[in-house]
């Protein structure tokens, strides 16, 4: 059994406001992230993602950063982190992040018209973050070459689908009766 699948099946489940969440090192930073798990994930991303002509990897803060940093190191593709903090730099673009859990502003720097980007994130759940990010990247004039998320919470449609984008995923899961259930161990292509 691969490490990602095994780690998800062993993930602790917590209940918050009547909703069951799995707690995982990729999506939450706890429990401890083992290097062999991160390595496996990065190799799978590199094999699955469309990397031809990609100029930049774009990831929303915060939990996509460790994954995207490792992919950047392995591919020599520069990394842009979309931050929740405004810096006021020239060319900074704001976007609304509306998820099933919260609403906030995020800020894109260092992405320009004509850039070929790979969007990476840890989890695709409601799709709100990635729908907002893809809209901002479109407004900038960047070309979204591919979108890859490590884990998809397969609970139906999401805002990214509604925005007209498909994300590739490494594994698709649901939390059923207080346990993580693997829906598709190979994810979406």
UniProtKB/Swiss-Prot annotation:
Pfam families named in the record: Pribosyltran
Keyword vocabulary terms for this entry: Purine salvage, Transferase
Record-linked NCBIfam families: HPT_Archaea (NF040646), PRK02304.1-4 (NF002635)
Species of provenance: Haloarcula marismortui (strain ATCC 43049 / DSM 3752 / JCM 8966 / VKM B-1809)
SUPFAM superfamilies on file: PRTase-like
GO biological process, one term: purine ribonucleoside salvage
Family of the protein in this entry: Belongs to the purine/pyrimidine phosphoribosyltransferase family. Archaeal HPRT subfamily.
GO molecular function: transferase activity
Superkingdom, natural source: Archaea
Name of the protein in question: HGPRTase-like protein 2
Function as written in the Swiss-Prot or TrEMBL entry: May catalyze a purine salvage reaction, the substrate is unknown.
PANTHER family in alphabetical order: HYPOXANTHINE/GUANINE PHOSPHORIBOSYLTRANSFERASE (PTHR43864), XANTHINE PHOSPHORIBOSYLTRANSFERASE (PTHR43864:SF1)
EC number: 2.4.2.-
Keyword Transferase attributed: yes
């Amino acid at each position: 059994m691969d490490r990602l699948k095994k780690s998800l099946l062993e993930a602790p489940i917590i209940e918050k406001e009547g909703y069951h969440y799995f707690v995982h090192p990729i999506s939450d930073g706890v429990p401890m992230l083992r290097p062999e798990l991160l390595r496996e994930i990065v190799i799978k991303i590199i094999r699955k993602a469309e990397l031809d002509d990609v100029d930049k990897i774009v990831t929303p803060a915060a939990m996509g950063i460790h994954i995207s940093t490792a992919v950047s190191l392995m591919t020599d593709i520069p990394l842009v982190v979309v931050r929740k903090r405004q810096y006021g730099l020239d060319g900074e673009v704001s976007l609304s992040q509306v998820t099933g859990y919260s609403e906030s502003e995020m800020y894109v720097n260092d992405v320009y018209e004509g850039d070929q980007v790979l969007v990476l994130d840890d989890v695709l759940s409601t799709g709100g973050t990635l729908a907002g990010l893809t809209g901002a990247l479109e407004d900038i004039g960047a070309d979204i070459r591919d979108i890859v998320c490590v884990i998809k919470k397969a609970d139906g449609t999401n805002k990214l689908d509604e925005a007209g984008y498909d994300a590739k995923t490494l594994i698709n899961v649901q939390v059923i009766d207080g346990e993580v259930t693997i829906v598709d161990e190979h994810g979406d292509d």
